[in-house]
Amino acid sequence: MTIEFSNFTFKYWALEKPTLKNINLTIGKGEKVVIVGPSGSGKSTLGQCLNGLIPFAVKGDCSGSLKINGKDTKSLDLHQCTNIVGTVLQDTDGQFVGLSVGEDIAFALENQMVIQEDMHTIVKDTAKMVELDDILDVSPFDLSGGQKQRVSLAGVMVDDVDILLFDEPLASLDPKTGKAAIDIIDHLHRDTGKTVIIIEHRLEDVLHRPVDRIIMMEQGEIVANMTPDQLIASDLLEQHGIREPLYISALKAAGCQITEDDKPAYFSTLNLDKFKPQIENWYHQSFVACTPENSERLLTVNNLSYSYDGIKNTLDDVSFHINKGEFVSILGKNGSGKSTITRLIMGVLEPDTGSIFMNGQDLAQSSIFERSQKIGIVLQNPNHMISHHMIFDEIASGLRNRGINEATVERKVFDILELCGLKKYRHWPIDALSYGQKKRVTIATILVLEPELLILDEPTAGQDYHHYTLMMEFVRELNRKLGITILIISHDMHLVLEYTQRAIVIANSQLLADAPVNTIFSQPALLEKANLTVTSLYSLAHAMGIERIDNFIHCFIEHEAKNK
Ligand SMILES: Nc1ncnc2c1ncn2[C@@H]1O[C@H](COP(=O)(O)OP(=O)(O)OP(=O)(O)O)[C@@H](O)[C@H]1O
Ligand SMILES: Nc1ncnc2c1ncn2[C@@H]1O[C@H](COP(=O)(O)OP(=O)(O)OP(=O)(O)O)[C@@H](O)[C@H]1O
């Protein structure tokens, strides 16, 4: 199935200007391509033109043509498009049709009239590939964010379509499952010859397996269309605010010049010998010792246990503390209970046993409202938080609830809109925003309230590097200047390395480790237990024969922080 966009332009009815401008792009049958680009650049819109959601479900004006296998999509209907293109959507909640995980995976098979006996086997085998076989009877809506993402992946794997489109398949997946997902996509691609299109901000993770081409979008246009080696060796990623792989950042930090001939797109193909002297030199020159942590307690979690069903403990005797002014992360496998900890801190759930103290006060004595005055939480899925139609009102709502006068509300909201890169959208309805832009709105809504403890659940999911850097630098400023304590829950190891000092690792419902990030990331066996993976920074140091990998990681963290 060849895909051919010719002079293709698309404008949403709700917007004045076109979102896709004069796109000329051919994707050949059986190709595997990645689409990258800043948030709001039109990646999902391009994907939706392919799967027929545009123009059949979402209205707008198109000009030029989009042909799939020579057929203009204007002559097809939505049903015909979905029979050609299978999609894993960015917001998985909108995608579930079954009452259980098993039914959901089986849905596509029912449509294909697969016989019952085969159906059970196919569903089981597919669920096993994405580690869902234990929870086939659970409702998709009772799953953690990453588990939902796995259900969507499984659903599309059984689809009998020629083109597979993945819109941010990795956003909520833990690192190990993310790698497994990329392996699965790679197998599907090689075994079936299907055309595969992956839209993703986590470029290094996608490049875990080879791809044919990377297409870069910016403001509705295609600004690059080249091989991964060409792109990684160029300055284009940096210019367009897209994060380069960690090992490339480390090589550049050491002053190495990387060319296409070095085959830099994959760690496994990169010729490292050439760079060894520079890396060693940089490491020996830049090592500085860790700064000691502040020891005044803000939050103390004591022996916390919680079970949703009264049978299996989601959290089992978990204890940790967070000091005032710290920037800490919680890491762990999908479904290990990280978001559950957040719900217990907020008071949405009550612990079965154990307690949580804030500033020496037992939170069991405080209502949800009282807790929300001190603790701000940004949930994983922005669509679970938004309750107003207009962006300004959404961000202003918390301040207005506190009875703050309108002039102050306006000033604070404008300041935060600017900081979060949302100023030009202030009069927009939230519906007209991309997923990443919505996520930024929800972060702005909480940041404007300047909480004492800020908890960010997957802050970078769906965010491009440029926007997330702006936002995280602002969060870091809140942390450094105002002493606001920050807790992030994330599967984004690059983010965790860049910003947090200490990581709390949860595995199999229990606390597995609580240590500085450079210590955590230099222990492969520990990472493995929590479905985390070593980063390419570790692999680089290892390949260079550096003994104290924790020190090497620490050097890199210091370098990044200084050069932001
Ligand atoms: N349903 C819609 N109605 C009107 N405008 C929309 C709609 N969906 C997206 N847009 C607009 O189109 C632009 C591109 O959005 P799109 O979702 O394609 O971006 P994206 O590159 O996928 O971003 P992200 O990485 O944040 O998901 C955005 O500026 C957004 O405001
Ligand atoms: N409302 C609910 N009812 C029943 N079980 C639930 C509910 N919410 C979560 N669970 C289960 O509790 C476990 C922990 O979920 P939680 O959302 O805390 O995980 P998580 O570590 O945040 O995962 P992720 O990294 O995927 O976001 C999961 O196995 C999930 O299926």
UniProtKB/Swiss-Prot annotation:
- Please list the coiled coil stretches: none
Q: Where is the ABC transporter domain?
A: 3-244, 299-533
Q: Which PROSITE patterns match?
A: ABC_TRANSPORTER_1, ABC_TRANSPORTER_2
Subcellular location as annotated: Cell inner membrane
- Which residues are ATP 1-binding? 37-44
UniProt keywords (A-Z) are: ATP-binding, Cell inner membrane, Cell membrane, Membrane, Nucleotide-binding, Repeat, Translocase, Transport
- Gene Ontology CC, one term: ATP-binding cassette (ABC) transporter complex
- Molecular functions per Gene Ontology: ATP binding; ATP hydrolysis activity; ATPase-coupled transmembrane transporter activity
Query: Would the keyword Metal-binding turn up in this protein's UniProt record?
Result: no
Name the EC number(s).
7.-.-.-
UniProt enzyme class: translocase
Mention any Pfam family matching this sequence. Answer: ABC_tran
Q: Which domain of life is it from?
A: Bacteria
Q: Which SMART domains match?
A: AAA (SM00382)
Q: Which residues bind ATP 2?
A: 332-339
Topology relative to the lipid bilayer, per the entry, is: Peripheral membrane protein
Q: Which family does it belong to?
A: Belongs to the ABC transporter superfamily.
Query: What function is annotated for this protein?
Result: Probably part of an ABC transporter complex. Responsible for energy coupling to the transport system.
Q: What is this protein called?
A: Putative ABC transporter ATP-binding protein PBPRA2240
- Protein species of origin: Photobacterium profundum (strain SS9)
